[in-house]
Amino acid sequence: MTIKFLSESTINRIAAGEVIERPASVVKELVENAVDASSTKIDIILERAGKNLIIISDDGIGMTDKELEIAVERHTTSKFDESDFLNINTFGFRGEALPSIAAISKMLITSKKRDADKAFQIKLIGGNEKQVTISVHNEGTKIEIRDLFFATPARLKFLRADKTELAATVGVVKKIALAHPKISFSLTHDGKNLLKLKGQNKDAETNLKQRIIDVIGDDFIKNAAYIDFKTPDFSICGYTSSPTYNRASSEDQFLFINNRPVKDKLLQIALRVAYQDYLARDRYPICAIFLQINPQLVDVNVHPAKAEVRFHDPDYVRNLLIEAIKNALTNKSHVTSTTIASDALELFKNPLVNKQSPVSKVINVNSKSADYRPTTHSILNTVPQNHVCQKLIDTLSHAKIEQEVENRIEHEQQIRKQYKLGAAKAQLHTTYIISQTEDSIVITDQHAAHKRLGYEKIKDYLKTEELIKQRLLIPEIVELPNEKKADCLYDHREKLYKLGLTLEKFGEKSIIVTEIPNILGDVNVQKLIQDLADHLSDFGKNIALTELIEHVTETYACHYSIRAGRKLSADEMNALLRQMENTLLSGQCNHGRPTYIELKLKDIERLFGR
């Protein structure tokens, strides 16, 4: 077969295959054009998820009849100066979208230039039969796309169900709307309004916050940390969720480069690294993060749909994003998700009561931190009625007892006012600490809370020096389930030695432990080694040192922490609460689960109809 030039229509159809994959691709290209046209209002209408009809209307600068004719030709644009290709600040710049869409659909464009007397219309069928006529239209542009992919029927077979295609389109519109809070957006499907976003005209931070509330939801903002980070060539702003407010997938992560929505692996990895101390590996944060960077330091022309970018210095960008997110999380480090308390209150409204089960015992706190305002009579009644105690009571004046009560109450009130997590009141099921503040009660998971404290303590210690070791009086022999796990621990013995563990191989499946980290105290060595083996065997020999330290620190923290089922005194409970208040990121354990929930008094009163 001889080599020949392709026809213009064939070239356009090939280009369409790269740029236009589904109705959402059409909506993306046309809405971005409307944004570039300085629109303040953009309306989208769909039928059958865009397969039958897509209409995009805007109030932008519009086009003349001559511009209409040129706009539907390949590689024509008004958006940048070709002499300055490195400074691209618009969504579009290749001049491919309109001719590519026209080549595979029936297109009708109606436009009126601002302050012009007439509107004009151009009609194309499969990219051909171009007809420009005078029309009637308001200022701006309306583009109608009918019978998408009629000219490439094979592509129709690859489209998903209407519901799936519609969801993709809604996602595209939401991303663009997030980046442009000053623009009003509406989206209608088969006559039903799906999205109506009002343009905001306040300061930039307020505009962004309101648009995020409208698109992602008010719950997200309540459970998110604000990011504000700047360098001479770089700025990052937006919101990222508290670790306890997370999802099972990364679908709710919105990332932008110079207001362009991207799905960039570098940024996603940076996000994962920033949260690695706070989230389990199968959970994902929610975020809307906007990176503004000098256009000369980023290449947006590396992907047909411009979904990916290439940075001049990717490591620099990655490290800055990690630092920005960690700084934001640190500022919100003691806060746990508000939705957790709401969910708990909902359960109280509809309790599942088992009438056969006995009421669990609650251990009351009888110390200076108790918030029970007893009378003299009630105190005397709680004292055992034996001869020694009775004789002691007889020697005490009522005035002294009442003074002790007043001192106790005053001390309690000071704690409730001074400390965020309040004063410990009781221990529930020997697992949860109940404390009281001025306007709420706080329920703390003692194991999760102490595990976070231990994790941070061990991690900080490892940054400066090796862990101090304690030699076991009798070396511990740990038998593991298989040889692979024993070999894995032995392969990492030198690294583990720096982390406080001294071990040797003992037979095929056993490890002998002679030294452990002093910080762990009287730890169950068998369980510690088995847990470490489980963690590390999945990675083999190639695990990086930083990742090894992460896994070891997590395992140490788990064995260092107070276990559920251990009774705590009032002093121990209050000491734990005070440590939490002074430790960063104490609102969640390192798997993203909350360490405490707070129930406001007003919400509790509402449960009782007060």
From Swiss-Prot:
InterPro entries recorded: DNA_mismatch_repair_CS (IPR014762), DNA_mismatch_repair_MutL (IPR020667), DNA_mismatch_S5_2-like (IPR013507), HATPase_C_sf (IPR036890), MutL/Mlh/PMS (IPR002099), MutL/Mlh/Pms-like (IPR038973), MutL_C (IPR014790), MutL_C_dimsub (IPR042120)
Q: Name one GO cellular component term.
A: mismatch repair complex
**Which key words tag this protein in UniProt?**
DNA damage, DNA repair
Gene3D superfamilies, per this entry?
3.30.230.10, Histidine kinase-like ATPase, C-terminal domain, MutL, C-terminal domain, dimerisation subdomain, MutL, C-terminal domain, regulatory subdomain
- Give a GO molecular function annotation for the protein: mismatched DNA binding
Q: Which GO terms describe its biological process?
A: mismatch repair
Q: Cross-referenced Pfam families, in alphabetical order?
A: DNA_mis_repair, HATPase_c_3, MutL_C
**HAMAP family according to UniProt:** DNA_mis_repair (MF_00149)
Hey, which family's this protein in?
A: Belongs to the DNA mismatch repair MutL/HexB family.
This chain's function reads:
This protein is involved in the repair of mismatches in DNA. It is required for dam-dependent methyl-directed DNA mismatch repair. May act as a 'molecular matchmaker', a protein that promotes the formation of a stable complex between two or more DNA-binding proteins in an ATP-dependent manner without itself being part of a final effector complex.
Q: What is this protein called?
A: DNA mismatch repair protein MutL
- Organism annotation: Rickettsia rickettsii (strain Iowa)
